[in-house]
Amino acid sequence: MSKYDSHLKCSFCGKSQEQVRKLIAGPGVYICDECVDLCNEILDEELLDTSGAAAQPAPKSEPPQKRRARSSNLSLSQIPKPREIKKYLDEHVIGQDEAKKVLSVAVYNHYKRLAILQSKGSGKNGDDAVELQKSNILLIGPTGCGKTLLAQTLAKILDVPFAVADATTLTEAGYVGEDVENILLRLLQVADLDVEEAQRGIIYIDEIDKIARKSENPSITRDVSGEGVQQALLKMLEGTVANVPPQGGRKHPYQDCIQIDTSNILFICGGAFVGLEKVVDQRGGKKSIGFVQPGEGQSKEKRAADVLRHLEPDDLVKFGMIPEFIGRVPMVAVVDPLDEEALMAILTQPRSALVKQYQKLLKMDNVQLDFKPDALKAIAQEAYRRKTGARALRGIVEELMLDVMYELPSRKDVTRCTVTREMVEKRSTAELLVHPSSLPKPESA
C-alpha cells in the first residue's frame, strides 16, 4: 500500500476510508459501503414504483405512525381548529395573542390545502378551478419574546413534519457555508427520509433578519450571506423542485440527490429586525407627526412594537430585504416584547415553567421548593433589565440555585426550601442549607 492510500475518499459522499466500513475501488473512482446501500435503496424504490407499490408490504423499518399518516385521508373533522391550536399554544407560551392567531389560522389553512390536494388526487373534488395558494409567514419581534418557542410548540401538536433552521449558517451556492437546500434536508430527516411526507411539512427559518443585505443600494461586491441567500430562497419559498444532497453539505455533479417539491411546504420566518421601527418612524414623519407617541409610562420596547404595527413592505426593503423575498412572505405578525408582568407569568404559568422544572428536580431529592411572590418579582425585574427577554430567566435562576443544587443531594436534613427576594438580590441561598439544629430555638411560653 502506498503512502497516499490513507487519504482515499469516496467519490460520492467524500468520506475518507477511516470513516466507512469498506471502500471499493474502480477505474479512478472509489465508492463506500454506505453509498452502495443508498444506491440499492433507490433501485428498490424504483422497482416498487414500476411493479405496483400498493401491492407490496411496507418496509419493516418504517414507523407505523408514518404508514398511517400516508395512508389516511385528511378530512375537516380531523384537522385541528384554529381555536384548538391557539389553546395549546396558550398552555406553553405567555401572551403574543396576535402571533398565535396568525400561526393558528395559517396552520389550519395549510391542513385544508393538503386535504384539497389529497381529494383532487383521488378524484373526489370536482371544484378544480379554484387553487389555494400558500401564505408564508414572517414573525417580527425582539430577542427572547417567544418566536422560536412558538414554532417549537407547534411542532409538538402537528401531524405534519416540522423542522427548524437557522438562516445565519446559510451562504450563496459556491461559498463556504450551507446551501439553502440543507433546510429541506432537515425536514426530510424529521420525516424519516419520506419524501412524500416532507412535501406536506412546515419549516421555521430563524434569524431571517440576519440575511438582510448590508446596504439599501446595490454593491459591486457580492453579498454571499445576505442578498445572495435571499435570492436562493425565492424559488424554495414560492414552490420548486429542489435537489437535496442526502448526506448534507455541498452538491457536486456526480452526487445522487433527492428531489423535493416545495409547493406545499409552509415556511415561517422569524427575526428580531433591530432598528426596523426607526425606518417605519422615519416614513411616518419626525417628532410630533410620527405614528405612535410615547404613552405615559410606556417602555421603549413597547413603543417600538406599536410602531411596527404600521409596517409596510417598503420599510422591509429599506431594512435590507429584497422586494421579491417580501412578496413571497405576505403574512406579517409582530411579536410583543415581554414586560415584567409577562416575565413573572413565564416563571410559573406555562406547563413546563422554569419554577416547575426546578421543583421537579428537587422533588427527586425529597425536597419541596417554594418561591415567594416577591422573589419571583425580583427575578422578573432583573431579567427585564438584562434586555434579553425570557432567556435571561433561566440564567438568573441557575445562578441562584447553583449552591442549592450542589449541596442538597448530599443533605438528608433539609426537606423544604423557600426562596425570598433577599436571596435573589444577594445571590445567596446559604440560609436554605443551614442545619435545623443550628437554628435558634423558639422561646418557650
UniProtKB/Swiss-Prot annotation:
<dbReference type="InterPro" id="IPR003959">
    <property type="entry name" value="ATPase_AAA_core"/>
</dbReference>
<dbReference type="GO" id="GO:0008270">
    <property type="term" value="F:zinc ion binding"/>
</dbReference>
<dbReference type="GO" id="GO:0016887">
    <property type="term" value="F:ATP hydrolysis activity"/>
</dbReference>
<dbReference type="GO" id="GO:0005524">
    <property type="term" value="F:ATP binding"/>
</dbReference>
<keyword id="KW-0479">Metal-binding</keyword>
<keyword id="KW-0547">Nucleotide-binding</keyword>
<comment type="function">
    <text>ATP-dependent specificity component of the Clp protease. It directs the protease to specific substrates. Can perform chaperone functions in the absence of ClpP.</text>
</comment>
<dbReference type="GO" id="GO:0051301">
    <property type="term" value="P:cell division"/>
</dbReference>
<comment type="subunit">
    <text>Component of the ClpX-ClpP complex. Forms a hexameric ring that, in the presence of ATP, binds to fourteen ClpP subunits assembled into a disk-like structure with a central cavity, resembling the structure of eukaryotic proteasomes.</text>
</comment>
<keyword id="KW-0143">Chaperone</keyword>
<protein>
    <recommendedName>
        <fullName>ATP-dependent Clp protease ATP-binding subunit ClpX</fullName>
    </recommendedName>
</protein>
<feature type="binding site">
    <location>
        <position position="32"/>
    </location>
    <ligand>
        <name>Zn(2+)</name>
    </ligand>
</feature>
<dbReference type="GO" id="GO:0140662">
    <property type="term" value="F:ATP-dependent protein folding chaperone"/>
</dbReference>
<feature type="binding site">
    <location>
        <position position="10"/>
    </location>
    <ligand>
        <name>Zn(2+)</name>
    </ligand>
</feature>
<dbReference type="GO" id="GO:0051082">
    <property type="term" value="F:unfolded protein binding"/>
</dbReference>
<dbReference type="GO" id="GO:0046983">
    <property type="term" value="F:protein dimerization activity"/>
</dbReference>
<keyword id="KW-0862">Zinc</keyword>
<dbReference type="InterPro" id="IPR004487">
    <property type="entry name" value="Clp_protease_ATP-bd_su_ClpX"/>
</dbReference>
<feature type="binding site">
    <location>
        <position position="35"/>
    </location>
    <ligand>
        <name>Zn(2+)</name>
    </ligand>
</feature>
<dbReference type="GO" id="GO:0051603">
    <property type="term" value="P:proteolysis involved in protein catabolic process"/>
</dbReference>
<dbReference type="InterPro" id="IPR003593">
    <property type="entry name" value="AAA+_ATPase"/>
</dbReference>
<dbReference type="Pfam" id="PF06689">
    <property type="entry name" value="zf-C4_ClpX"/>
</dbReference>
<dbReference type="InterPro" id="IPR046425">
    <property type="entry name" value="ClpX_bact"/>
</dbReference>
<dbReference type="InterPro" id="IPR050052">
    <property type="entry name" value="ATP-dep_Clp_protease_ClpX"/>
</dbReference>
<comment type="similarity">
    <text>Belongs to the ClpX chaperone family.</text>
</comment>
<dbReference type="InterPro" id="IPR010603">
    <property type="entry name" value="Znf_CppX_C4"/>
</dbReference>
<dbReference type="InterPro" id="IPR019489">
    <property type="entry name" value="Clp_ATPase_C"/>
</dbReference>
<dbReference type="InterPro" id="IPR027417">
    <property type="entry name" value="P-loop_NTPase"/>
</dbReference>
<keyword id="KW-0067">ATP-binding</keyword>
<dbReference type="GO" id="GO:0009376">
    <property type="term" value="C:HslUV protease complex"/>
</dbReference>
<feature type="binding site">
    <location>
        <begin position="142"/>
        <end position="149"/>
    </location>
    <ligand>
        <name>ATP</name>
    </ligand>
</feature>
<dbReference type="InterPro" id="IPR038366">
    <property type="entry name" value="Znf_CppX_C4_sf"/>
</dbReference>
<feature type="region of interest" description="Disordered">
    <location>
        <begin position="53"/>
        <end position="76"/>
    </location>
</feature>
<dbReference type="Pfam" id="PF10431">
    <property type="entry name" value="ClpB_D2-small"/>
</dbReference>
<feature type="binding site">
    <location>
        <position position="13"/>
    </location>
    <ligand>
        <name>Zn(2+)</name>
    </ligand>
</feature>
<feature type="domain" description="ClpX-type ZB">
    <location>
        <begin position="1"/>
        <end position="51"/>
    </location>
</feature>
<dbReference type="Pfam" id="PF07724">
    <property type="entry name" value="AAA_2"/>
</dbReference>
